[in-house]
Amino acid sequence: MEALGLFGAGIATLISRILAVMALVVVIAKMKKYKELKPSVSTGPEIHRMKHLLFLGLPISIQLGLEASSFNICAIFMGWLGSIPLAAHQIMCTISTLCFQIVYGIGAAASVLISQFRGVGDWHNVRRTANTAFFIGIALILMMIGMIQIFRYPLVSCFTTSEEVVSVVLSLIPCFFIYQFGDCMQITFANALRGIAEVKKLMLYAFISYVIVSIPLSYVFAFIFGWGGVGVWMGMPFGLTTAGFLFYFEFRSKIKKL
């Protein structure tokens, strides 16, 4: 069979997503503990529930969209610098996403526990869960930073054989390390706010952090200061750390009022 290249990669991704959905449907349908989750045929859409879901979901969607857009705009900036910086950016985004998903898993778990404690009015454990999740995230980040630092050459070489691209990726890794603290903070406390259903300000804080802080600084560092690809990535720690502190102070203020 003839190699399909990028088109084949797209087909493989589509198939994996379809199989994942099918697997989840089968698990929910067959396992007894998910019996209550099975939808009834007679169950129709409930307007008041739809409104509540939109009220909670839209700010979260906008917050996540703004964060993702800041990375996408940075990709455009890297493209202006040339194909080699753009390739390096894509490799770093892949490495960054892996680390993000690990920490995000802890944040998502914290969100579930926080919502349970909120439901029974146990605000002491709401606070403790958020703080514990943050420190677990920091511990995981330190482990990942150590592993990436030790194995950075073989890790980057898995993606490309181009020495030029490898060199640029290695120059971006310190920027990636710098923003891990802020990223962990914003992941943890954004999820904590979701757990207590306080999401309205998430999109405002995301707009401030990514649109007003991160993207302009990436441009200034890269093209006005002349730092190139490193400059693009140096804007990210400022945006993510700003988001982290804004989410943290919002969470703390909400907890104090309750």
Located regions from the model:
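Helix-terminus/linker motif at the lipid-water interface of multi-pass membrane proteins
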Residues: M1-L6, G65-M92, L98, Q116-F117, ...
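Short alpha-helical transmembrane segments in multi-pass integral membrane proteins
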Residues: M1-L58, I114-Y179, F221-L258
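Small-residue-enriched core segments of transmembrane alpha-helices in multipass membrane transport
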Residues: T94-I95, P174, F207-P216
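Transmembrane alpha-helical segments of integral membrane proteins
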Residues: I187-T188, V213-A222
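Hydrophobic faces of transmembrane alpha-helices in multi-pass small-molecule transporters and flippases
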Residues: A23-V26, S42-I73, F77, L98, ...
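Small-residue-rich hydrophobic transmembrane alpha-helices
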Residues: A75, A88-R152, D183-Y205
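Transmembrane alpha-helical core positions of polytopic small-molecule transporters
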Residues: E67-A68, Y104, D183-C184, V211-S214
